[in-house]
Amino acid sequence: MSRAIAVVIAVVLASPVAAQQGVNPIHPVFAPLDAAGKKVRTAQEMNPEKTCGACHDAAYIAAHTDHKAPRSAATCIQCHVSGARLDVRPERLDAEGKLRRDAIRIGTPRAANCATCHGLVLDVGAPVVLPDSFEAAPAVGRTWSLTRGEGAIIAPQRMVDSFLDLEGKESLAAPWDVHAAKLVDCVACHYARNSPARTDGKQGSLRYLTADPRRQTQAEFLVRPDHRLAEQDCRGCHDPLKAHAFLPYRERHMEVLSCTVCHASGPMGPAAEMVDATSVTAAGGPSVTYRNVDRRDGDTLNTATIRPLRPLLIERVESDGVRRVAPVNLVSRYRWVSRTDGADVPFEIVARAWLEGGAHAPEVVNALDADRNGRIDGAELRLDTPQKAEFIAARLRALGVEDPAVVGNLDAHPLAHGISTRDRALRDCNACHSEDSRLSDEYVVASYLPGGSPPRPPDGARVALAGTIAPSAAGGLVLQRDREAAPGILHVLGHSRQAWTNRIGFLVFLAVLLGVTVHGGLRYAMRRKRSHVAHPAAEKEYVFGRYERLWHWTMALSGIALIVTGLEVHGTGKWALMSLSTSVAIHNAFAVILIVNGFLALFYHLATAAIRNFIPHPRGFLASALEHMTYQARGIFYGESHPRNAAGQKLNPLQQVTYLALLNVLFPLQIVTGALIWAVGKWPAVASAVAGLHYVAPIHNLGAWLFLTFFVLHVYLVSTGRTPTDHLKSMITGYQHVDADEPEPEGAAR
């Protein structure tokens, strides 16, 4: 059985990769040249730059390329020739020493060319399997940056049909890469910037130009193609505002989030956490720790369980120059360098320091084999102590390396490839808008520290790591982030916490709640002592008209709905009464109802002059206020009659002051801040003007606490009538009990 599986895998690995260049009928025939410009008859003798430079401006291309040494060493042949190899043999040459037409398979780079360095690319005829070279000694220029860095595998096949052991594999009917399935090649996004076929860019520094119609001719472009490749993002082809009707506040989401936050949320390829080229495995490759691979002893990557990658969300400047939250995978890369000139020690020399005869040298085994089983594997490969690092450094010095040292870099690989179908896109709002948000994940930076040195953070201004890199319990490093630091200054509903407004609001609420509890308890105790005392005679008077009651109950129900949905938005994931999007929709609807009701009530009170009930009169105000305060502090406990209001007033001085603050300060404050929160989600310009929700949301939050406090106090004071339900009934029926010796309120409704 195992032999059969091996045969199948061998056939797969031998299958052709994604479609490559065919015979080019247009490209002129040419003579292969060596570095001196002389004709040669074999591929080994040929110099690509000299050969191609006979027609193309090789100097210009070398000065305008993203693939220059030492970062990469891509040649013309690797990128433009089928199979990354030009078939130069004597029998392929004509009498003039020129390559025959049928051997010229030169053209636009295809995905297979990119795969020779960057990652795993397979065509429709080859189920996905990881080749042996994936963990072998690194070839020159081969970085596996797509697969190791992003967990991306560029293939049109369904993931369920692969040979890999994927978690939840039976449900993975989507292709590995939807663009590969739709025959979209790498150059669709990464094209030459000065290509005349592209009209979506501009040259020069004129800021007011969105496109420059002045283009090179095709002939000029073929001589001087710019090899600084474009980084086209999703918005270059897709209009996200037309494809996310279900998403609330689409404009705000698209302004601050990269498309890949939801559409590349769980790549299924093996993504590296750490590439340690200071140590060498028995297979001759660097020691690699994977972030999403559960690997047992003896497992290969084809038999180990691969989980969906949970990326780190950070702020990153995208190709359009806008800083957005984007998913990245942090990879710590360690290597040996020479302190003398700062140059990297070639991995071949590092391998010689570790290996002898295709296996670990006996001296290395003797020094690093902690369990004395005769081999080095697992944690034994780690140079995580000064003694281990010095042992290998001494062997490197013996091989001629001057002053070797361990250096680490932290690379942030943006997840921009391996995009799957929309059914695998993240649709759970709680993934970000909750206490356990992906925005504040603790992220492992390094499992251990080779040579004891931490990796250097990413260079450049494109990536912003928010948080603190701190030691982990396992001896490595983790990126720790709190709710306010991740990422940047974004305020995320349901996740971000307004510490100072919560503290102030809760303390005020707690003080009022404690006060009414104590006050109510004393009232109850004193009422029991005088339970034999009858209530004084009273008459029913029609005090509250129909519209006043309708206005009051509409306001009350709207306020309750706003408090409940506000708590749901603020504490998403804790209450689980409804989804975040539903809570936001209901909250906004009741906010509109409350505002409309408030303006209609204002018109009513102005038109009927009932507004006078809310305006305190200076004459006798302090005396009346003191009388009502004395009653609440003492008289209510002994059954004394409620103090009379001033003639023509429905509200006592304490109520007038409270409603004056409520209707003229707190109510407008909540309307303005709530409207700004809504506007920030609709219009990006508003977000920029008010710094997002960073300041507006805490103020709105404090207002909500004060509204909740007023609600508790208001409900309690309802119970302070002749009976606990007397005031409540009056707001339902309109009739209120008035002591017989108490004159009828002049403002009573008829």
Which residues does each PLM region occupy?
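Positively charged n-region of N-terminal signal peptides that target proteins for export
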Residues: 1-4
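Bacterial N-terminal signal peptides
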Residues: 6-16
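A generic structural micro-environment signature
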Residues: 7, 52, 374, 382, ...
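Generic low-polarity alpha-helical segments
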Residues: 14, 20, 74-79, 114-117, ...
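Intrinsic-disorder/low-complexity coil detector
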Residues: 15, 24-27, 31, 683, ...
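C-type cytochrome heme-c attachment and multiheme electron-transfer modules
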Residues: 20-533, 624-658, 748-750
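Membrane-embedded alpha-helical bundles that constitute the cytochrome b-like, heme-associated redox core
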Residues: 463-495, 502-750
